[in-house]
């Protein structure tokens, strides 16, 4: 509701009833309703946040997902266009942030998974923007925490300045693909042994 000079806004599932209309995780399989609404209403974009408003995803004008991995990438691109500096994301994030950071003359740093680890690394290197590949944007100019509303403001500002449609903006970034699957671990699986074997097997390779 605080989007300012927006020509037309339509809300979906914004009333706090105590029950989620669908799985609240902002993943493509859970966002079919808003994707269809964006196309039906000929909207410029759709904005999606999770219940505690620390994850942010966008839907492009054609109903496709902007992909939450690229939320941070686009926001960082905007921030770095105005202020040179370094960026941080965790190891479960797209390499596209590294590409954008280096293109803007900065240095990318990776952290262990977890918001607390990202924040610690950001403070260590003095990063100007950081976050996680799940759509979490951390902008230290305001505070050291994932904040979807900050991400919305930065993203919309950048989109307005570029004059691009969502799909066109997305096309300006490298296309990387990731499969994030949860693996059930049992006591019979020696995780440390598996990691050691992977390290040994690829010892001669350059890991990035």
Question: Where are the model-predicted features located?
Answer:
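N-terminal small/polar loop signature for handling phosphorylated ligands or for N-terminal nucleophile
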Residues: 9-59
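Short Gly/Thr/Asp-enriched flexible loops that form oxyanion-binding sites at enzyme active sites
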Residues: 54-72, 97-98
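Short hydrophobic/aromatic-enriched beta-strand-loop microsegments
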Residues: 8-13, 65-70, 105-113
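Short, charged, surface-exposed secondary-structure boundary motifs
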Residues: 17-24, 77-79, 118-122
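Phosphate-binding and adjacent anionic-ligand microenvironments
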Residues: 45, 83-208
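Short glycine/threonine-rich catalytic loop with a Thr-x-Gly-x-Asp
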Residues: 49-51, 65-70, 143-146
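Short, acidic/small-residue loops that bind anionic groups at enzyme active sites
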Residues: 65-82, 86, 112-114
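Short, small-residue-biased leader/transition segments that mark boundaries at the very start
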Residues: 2-7
């Amino acid at each position: 509701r605080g989007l300012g000079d927006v020509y037309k806004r339509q809300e979906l599932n914004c009333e706090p009833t105590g029950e989620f209309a669908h799985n609240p995780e902002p993943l493509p399989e859970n966002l079919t309703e808003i994707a269809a609404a964006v196309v039906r209403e000929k909207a410029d974009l759709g904005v999606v946040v999770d219940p505690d408003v620390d994850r942010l995803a966008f839907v492009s004008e054609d109903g496709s997902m902007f992909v939450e991995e690229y939320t941070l990438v686009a926001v960082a691109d905007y921030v770095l266009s105005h202020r040179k500096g370094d960026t941080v994301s965790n190891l479960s994030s797209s390499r596209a942030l590294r590409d954008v950071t280096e293109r803007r003359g900065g240095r990318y740093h990776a952290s262990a998974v977890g918001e607390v680890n990202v924040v610690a690394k950001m403070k260590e290197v003095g990063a100007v923007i950081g976050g996680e590949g799940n759509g979490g944007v951390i902008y230290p100019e305001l505070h050291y925490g994932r904040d979807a509303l900050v991400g919305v403001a930065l993203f919309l500002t950048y989109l307005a300045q570029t004059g691009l449609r969502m799909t066109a903006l997305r096309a300006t970034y490298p296309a990387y693909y990731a499969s994030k699957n949860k693996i059930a671990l049992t006591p019979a699986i020696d995780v440390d042994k598996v990691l050691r074997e992977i390290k040994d097997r690829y010892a001669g390779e350059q890991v990035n």
